[in-house]
């Protein structure tokens, strides 16, 4: 932001894509931004449970953010998102099944932080949530599982995050990664329609 000449992140409005609504949060924008950063970083971290899952999905979402940032006229952000997409694709060569190297919490939380910080700077938080809906679903599956178990002592999913639920349901690790990646590609196409 400091190098953007103040052209980004002015005001406290948020944009809701697909409906093209703009809502001014006022002072509530600060906790909203904090929530987005913390939630998205942790959601990407929760997604990093299978070989190639987080890196493959993040490569697609980052490439989508390149297109979104160019279409909104933010010509410096494609460099950041392009670097993230390229790094994830390079990392994916060594992280695909069977993985020779693992991302770990530091890598996955950094990726979530970069994606969310860039989206916040461009006021595209909800557009990021559309493209990265897999991250949101993964995080919600953990929240639902823990909350429901504490209340009833029963589980909704076989295991949380939800990618492990599918694994325990008989899906192979590569099938889960492939399906989640295809779903992310479709979500990115939906996000493109919102531009």
Walk through the language-model features, giving the residues of each.
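Alpha-helical transmembrane segments
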Residues: 1-3, 19, 26-195
